[in-house]
From Swiss-Prot:
The keyword RNA-binding does not apply. It holds the Pfam family DCD. GO terms for molecular function: dCTP deaminase (dUMP-forming) activity; dCTP deaminase activity; nucleotide binding. It comes from the Archaea. Pathway: Pyrimidine metabolism; dUMP biosynthesis; dUMP from dCTP: step 1/1. GO terms for biological process: dUMP biosynthetic process; dUTP biosynthetic process. The active site is at 145 (proton donor/acceptor). This is dCTP deaminase, dUMP-forming. Its EC number is 3.5.4.30. It comes from Methanococcus vannielii (strain ATCC 35089 / DSM 1224 / JCM 13029 / OCM 148 / SB). It is an enzyme of class 3 (hydrolase). Homotrimer. Bifunctional enzyme that catalyzes both the deamination of dCTP to dUTP and the hydrolysis of dUTP to dUMP without releasing the toxic dUTP intermediate. Keywords: Hydrolase, Nucleotide metabolism, Nucleotide-binding.
Length: 206
């Protein structure tokens, strides 16, 4: 059962669902809009060897960032021209990880799904790849996987980037996501790189 605007407000007002910060104007008919935070990660790897710790760079923006498609030609001259022309803080090509401003806490009988806003789909920017599902009992900020597929897109800190759709489960989970021993991204308060290498470590322990 998907929660309506009335349900979302009831769950938030009762404290069963926590969204911090919460903005009443971001409640849609059956969703809640979330905003883009200031923290990002780009990887330094030529090849993603998922058995290993992936080298990455973390950074923050003051105002805006330009996301370019992977094969969009960039050099220092072009980057400086973009920065000057569009008054942006940073220019990146290829995929990058971002995060929501919102810290979300779900009870064991509510799960959620993240979807990018359709307005961004219309400029061929995707803000999640495969990680749109949020298990019941999750606590943390939502990490975003951001890719531009056509032309460069400028994103602004604190703008609405996507939405959460909440669903009520038929029965509560025995152990919520953030209480599971093997949960990799529980209680994340910032953008997090892939921790898939832990899958191999856990397999060895078992």
């Amino acid at each position: 059962m998907i929660l309506s605007d009335k349900d979302i407000l009831n769950y938030v007002n009762s404290g069963r669902v926590c969204i911090n910060p919460f903005n009443r104007n971001f409640v849609g008919p059956c969703s809640y809009d979330v905003t883009l935070g200031e923290e990002f990660i780009t990887y330094n790897e030529d090849v993603y060897d998922v058995k290993k710790q992936l080298s990455h760079r973390s950074f923050k923006i003051d105002n805006s960032i330009m996301v370019c498609p992977l094969h969009h030609h960039l050099d220092e001259k072009i980057i400086e021209r973009y920065k000057e022309k569009y008054s942006i803080d940073c220019v990146v090509s290829g995929g990058l990880l971002g995060t929501t401003n919102e810290y979300v806490e779900l009870p064991n009988d509510v799960c959620a799904q993240y979807q990018g806003r359709s307005s961004f789909g219309r400029v061929f920017l995707q803000s999640h790849q495969t990680a749109g599902w949020i298990d019941s009992g999750f606590k943390g900020k939502i990490t975003l996987e951001i890719v531009a597929y056509d032309k460069p897109v400028i994103l602004y800190k604190n703008q609405r980037i996507g939405q959460l759709i909440f669903s009520k489960t038929l029965s509560p989970a025995d152990i919520g996501y953030s209480d599971r021993k093997c949960s990799k991204y529980a209680r994340q308060t910032s953008v997090m790189p892939s921790l898939i290498k832990k899958d191999f470590e856990n397999d060895l322990e078992e």
